[in-house]
């Protein structure tokens, strides 16, 4: 993954799968602007300085996970890696766990996450109960922000023509 914007989108809209070794956030695959449709797994690895203090350990953790994904046995993940955009936030346990266990944990998380990806925007967020506005309802001033949305009926929006009045 490239750029803060892609990471922000996955963090905001991605489904989370937690494991003692890492946290996986993933969304459905969508090509970048101007890119051809080529479904594949695009995974960004994140290791914070708070999690692993030394750069050598952070780099070793990244290399271990990258190699575990690259050499994933087909029996662990039939069909290969799912087409998705994902962020793997690594924990210190990645350095000490045996390699086959790391691969098994990654495969299990990817399988769980592939079925749980969220689609669309963040509709449930914003503080109002009940989610978004239902078609035909008028949104009141529930948030206290001073903004009111009014219902617009497309048939009554334009004045009646002289032919319709008679």
UniProtKB/Swiss-Prot annotation:
<dbReference type="InterPro" id="IPR020539">
    <property type="entry name" value="RNase_P_CS"/>
</dbReference>
<comment type="similarity">
    <text>Belongs to the RnpA family.</text>
</comment>
<comment type="subunit">
    <text>Consists of a catalytic RNA component (M1 or rnpB) and a protein subunit.</text>
</comment>
<keyword id="KW-0819">tRNA processing</keyword>
<keyword id="KW-0540">Nuclease</keyword>
<dbReference type="GO" id="GO:0004526">
    <property type="term" value="F:ribonuclease P activity"/>
</dbReference>
<keyword id="KW-0378">Hydrolase</keyword>
<dbReference type="Pfam" id="PF00825">
    <property type="entry name" value="Ribonuclease_P"/>
</dbReference>
<dbReference type="GO" id="GO:0030677">
    <property type="term" value="C:ribonuclease P complex"/>
</dbReference>
<dbReference type="InterPro" id="IPR014721">
    <property type="entry name" value="Ribsml_uS5_D2-typ_fold_subgr"/>
</dbReference>
<feature type="compositionally biased region" description="Polar residues">
    <location>
        <begin position="142"/>
        <end position="159"/>
    </location>
</feature>
<dbReference type="InterPro" id="IPR000100">
    <property type="entry name" value="RNase_P"/>
</dbReference>
<dbReference type="GO" id="GO:0042781">
    <property type="term" value="F:3'-tRNA processing endoribonuclease activity"/>
</dbReference>
<comment type="function">
    <text>RNaseP catalyzes the removal of the 5'-leader sequence from pre-tRNA to produce the mature 5'-terminus. It can also cleave other RNA substrates such as 4.5S RNA. The protein component plays an auxiliary but essential role in vivo by binding to the 5'-leader sequence and broadening the substrate specificity of the ribozyme.</text>
</comment>
<protein>
    <recommendedName>
        <fullName>Ribonuclease P protein component</fullName>
        <ecNumber>3.1.26.5</ecNumber>
    </recommendedName>
</protein>
<keyword id="KW-0255">Endonuclease</keyword>
<keyword id="KW-0694">RNA-binding</keyword>
<dbReference type="GO" id="GO:0042780">
    <property type="term" value="P:tRNA 3'-end processing"/>
</dbReference>
<dbReference type="GO" id="GO:0000049">
    <property type="term" value="F:tRNA binding"/>
</dbReference>
<feature type="region of interest" description="Disordered">
    <location>
        <begin position="115"/>
        <end position="166"/>
    </location>
</feature>
<dbReference type="InterPro" id="IPR020568">
    <property type="entry name" value="Ribosomal_Su5_D2-typ_SF"/>
</dbReference>
<dbReference type="GO" id="GO:0001682">
    <property type="term" value="P:tRNA 5'-leader removal"/>
</dbReference>
């Amino acid at each position: 993954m490239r750029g803060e914007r892609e990471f922000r989108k996955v963090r905001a809209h991605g489904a989370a799968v937690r494991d003692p070794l890492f946290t996986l956030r993933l969304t459905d695959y969508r090509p970048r602007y101007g890119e051809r449709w080529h479904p594949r797994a695009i995974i960004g690895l994140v290791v914070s300085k708070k999690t692993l203090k030394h750069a050598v350990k952070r780099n070793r953790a990244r290399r271990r996970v990258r190699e575990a994904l690259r050499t994933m046995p087909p029996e662990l993940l039939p069909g290969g890696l799912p087409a998705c955009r994902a962020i793997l936030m690594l924990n210190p346990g990645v350095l000490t766990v045996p390699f086959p266990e790391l691969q098994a944990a990654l495969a299990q998380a990817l399988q769980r996450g592939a079925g749980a990806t969220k689609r669309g925007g963040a509709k449930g967020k914003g503080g109002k109960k009940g989610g978004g506005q239902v078609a035909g309802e008028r949104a009141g001033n529930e948030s206290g922000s001073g903004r009111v949305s009014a219902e617009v009926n497309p048939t009554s929006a334009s004045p009646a023509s002289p032919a319709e009045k008679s």
